[in-house]
Amino acid sequence: MIDLTLQRASTSAVPDSAAFRLWAEAALEKPHAEVVIRIVDREESAALNSTYRGKTGPTNVLSFPFVVPEGVPNDLLGDLVICAPVVEREAAEQGKPVEAHWAHMVVHGMLHLQGYDHIEEAEAEIMENREIAILRGLGMENPYREIRPE
């Protein structure tokens, strides 16, 4: 079960809270967790991307895992920041349904919060396979398959 807080700081149209909860719970690998998902605009995403990753411009999803001190019980998993305009643009560029791309970004971010990464090729393969399996369980296509816009 997930205790999800959804913050909407963007004027873009986004899926409803129930969809975010469904996607986050599908990727959750522990019995209970608290997560904040903040939906932002390009400016906030770019500022956070610069501050925390040293990269210029907005990005699709940023994850901020909460590091729990050893021996302290805590269900707080962390925060995800998703840039609505970037998700919409990427979905269009990749010829994917926008809702499927939203789901992918939530699943991707949730896996990051749980320690998955894609810096090394072997890690990336593990993470991508996990994403594909979770999204398949939600009735969605493989987000990494090549799709050409019509």
Swiss-Prot record:
Task: Give an example GO cellular component term for this record.
Answer: cytoplasm
Q: What cofactor requirement does the entry state? A: Zn(2+)
- Positions contributing to Zn(2+) binding: 108, 112, 118
Please provide an example of a Pfam family that matches this protein in its UniProt record: YbeY
Q: Under which EC number(s) is this enzyme classified?
A: 3.1.-.-
**What are the UniProt keywords, alphabetically?**
Cytoplasm, Endonuclease, Hydrolase, Metal-binding, Nuclease, Ribosome biogenesis, rRNA processing, Zinc
Would the keyword Zinc turn up in this protein's UniProt record? yes
Q: Which GO terms describe its biological process?
A: rRNA processing
Keyword Cytoplasm (UniProt): yes
Cofactor stoichiometry and binding? Binds 1 zinc ion.
- UniProt cross-references to InterPro entries, sorted A to Z: MetalPrtase_cat_dom_sf_prd, YbeY, YbeY_CS
Give the enzyme's main class according to its UniProt record, as a single word: hydrolase
Q: Which GO terms fall under molecular function for this chain's record?
A: metalloendopeptidase activity; RNA endonuclease activity; zinc ion binding
Q: Which Gene3D superfamilies match?
A: Metalloproteases ('zincins'), catalytic domain (3.40.390.30)
Cell compartments where the protein resides: Cytoplasm
Query: Per the annotation, which location comes first and is thus the protein's main one?
Result: cytoplasm
Q: What does this protein do?
A: Single strand-specific metallo-endoribonuclease involved in late-stage 70S ribosome quality control and in maturation of the 3' terminus of the 16S rRNA.
PANTHER family per the record? ENDORIBONUCLEASE YBEY, CHLOROPLASTIC
Annotated family: Belongs to the endoribonuclease YbeY family.
Which protein, by its recorded name, is this? Endoribonuclease YbeY
Give the species this sequence originates from: Methylococcus capsulatus (strain ATCC 33009 / NCIMB 11132 / Bath)
